[in-house]
Amino acid sequence: MITISDAAQAHFVTLLADQPEGTHIRVFVISPGTATAECGVSYCPPDAVEADDMEFEFNGFNAMVDEKSAPFLEEASIDFVTDQLGSQLTLKAPNAKMRKVASDAPLSERIDYVIQSEINPQLASHGGNIMLVEVTEEGTAILQFGGGCNGCSMVDVTLKDGIETQLLEKFPGELTGVKDVTEHQHGDHSYQ
């Protein structure tokens, strides 16, 4: 479920040495499954362990995960990175905002997962997003742009060279193309 690098494990052992006996760490997600999901790590003293917590053993400490956060921490990783600017813990949880879908889930669910977990984070840098409206019987993903993408002069390039290319690579033989059904209106909200 959660991978903690050797460097991060050593860092946690050092931090926990200054805490009361029996203190471990807690890895959690606030607002899991939403666009505002945030992950965190905190100390977990013995009296803060809940009956439904999942417990994972590491070198010199355990990591507690609450039942609600667990599915959103699938494939999560924690590392301790040192560079010229110093050192920091990094926590990556690719499924925090949306639960990973099974490989045999309906095509629309798998496309929506890729949109939410991979494409929308890229578009967010311009204040934009896309939403899957439907997948036609012919295998065309019908998309609607929102935020800064609505009315952006580069939307056609983003759609064909970015989104369509990415989705066709992910779903060969299932998806035949993408189509934008947004009624674009250029305004102050538009990126370009």
From Swiss-Prot:
Binding site for [4Fe-4S] cluster: C149, C152
Entry's cofactor comment: Binds 1 [4Fe-4S] cluster per subunit. The cluster is presumably bound at the interface of two monomers.
Pfam families the record matches: Fe-S_biosyn (PF01521), NifU (PF01106)
GO molecular function per UniProt: 4 iron, 4 sulfur cluster binding; iron ion binding
GO annotation terms (biological process): iron-sulfur cluster assembly; protein maturation
Disulfide bonds: none
Keywords: 4Fe-4S, Iron, Iron-sulfur, Metal-binding
Keyword RNA-binding annotated: no
UniProt cofactor(s): [4Fe-4S] cluster
Keyword field contains 4Fe-4S: yes
Gene3D superfamilies assigned to the protein according to its UniProt record, in alphabetical order: Fe-S cluster assembly (FSCA) (3.30.300.130), HesB-like domain (2.60.300.12)
InterPro entries reported for this sequence: Fe/S_biogenesis_protein_NfuA, FeS_biogenesis, FSCA_dom_sf, HesB-like_dom_sf, NIF_FeS_clus_asmbl_NifU_C
Known partners and oligomeric status: Homodimer.
Name recorded for this polypeptide: Fe/S biogenesis protein NfuA
Species assigned in the record: Shewanella sediminis (strain HAW-EB3)
Lineage of the organism: Bacteria, Pseudomonadati, Pseudomonadota, Gammaproteobacteria, Alteromonadales
